[in-house]
Amino acid sequence: TNIHTAVLQKGRPVEEISQLTPQMLKDGSWEGKSFRKYNIGLPPPRITPGRKHPYKEFLDNVKYKFVAMGFEEMRGGLVENEFWNMDALYMPQFHPARDIHDVYYVKEPASSKEIEEPFRTRVSDAHYSGGDTGSRGWKYHFDIEKAKRLMLRSQGTAVSARTLAGNPKIPGKYFSIARCFRYEQVDATHAQDFFQIEGIVLGDDINFRTLLGLLELFALEIAKAKEIEFLPAYFPFTEPSVELHVKHPKLGWMELGGAGIFRPEVTIPL
């Protein structure tokens, strides 16, 4: 019937082209073709791109700031021996100061290779009698087997110790964003796995005032702090030592970091 014929004619499939290509323009094959109409009302396919973790983005920004201030990046392994993590920093093997760092020890292998000379002898002498540092030392016999015990790095200063022993440039400025591990009770301000920002400045014409100025710059540029204050502190490997505190608009005063001038017992043996 006429109705059936009309329905069949209307439903007959028509070839449509969805995309006009350069080749079609070149050979003229587009002429006489039917092109699919665009429906601008259709929603586009949803794209779910990957994004940086906010904390990773913050660490990248910190790295950028340090490089912009003329610092060179230091690197080190996640697994370290007690010698570079503590002994080289004049932390005695028996002292309560060492208990600050409740660490994770490596089960296998439990110990590192022999400690490199002359650092082994120099650090051992500094602990026993002060060596060439002018100090009286800690007056105990250094246990080299304890110094070789492997552990997960508990502080970023271990990276600085290895840098000092590696003939760094003087004057020079170095930094690291070191992943550290401690056997902590996890709470709002403590974690067992964290990143520690570390920096050292080497030179003949720098002093404690230079350090305070750099800490203030750090607080302003990286923490965007409006109010800062310095408080006296104690660290086994620096003297004098200082804590940097900043005022958070909601949390109030909080510690941003600790710093100090490396003791001769640290710098001279290295």
Give the predicted meaning of each segment:
Residues 4-270:
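TRNA-recognition modules of translation machinery and tRNA-sensing kinases, especially anticodon-binding
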